[in-house]
């Protein structure tokens, strides 16, 4: 199988304020539930614009926050294919918030970290080590 590599990246699952106030879905903004999601992503394009991990391989469980108060409520769960991608926050600088970057996706804060992460995914694909990606989300309390 090869050597395992473990890396940790500063990221967020917090949707942007704009999506909290005006969600894309009638039942509320998506917030990824903590847990392990195996094989749910493949390399693709986020909104057709740049390389990202896109949800194609399995369902993800989310919370739906529908009260429009910009505070995450971890109550109403839904599981399925929601287009939860892993993408960057800013293109060229560290971001202190998600601005309008996220409707519930996972965003890596540092563009340099993101570039490294995507390159590791590309290398895995190129070396025949697999084209599906898993992740484990631990929520800070």
Identify the meaning behind each predicted range.
Residues 1-99, 113-133, 138-141:
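Cell wall/extracellular polymer interaction/catalysis modules
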Residues 108-109:
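A conserved hydrophobic position in a structured secondary element of the catalytic/binding core
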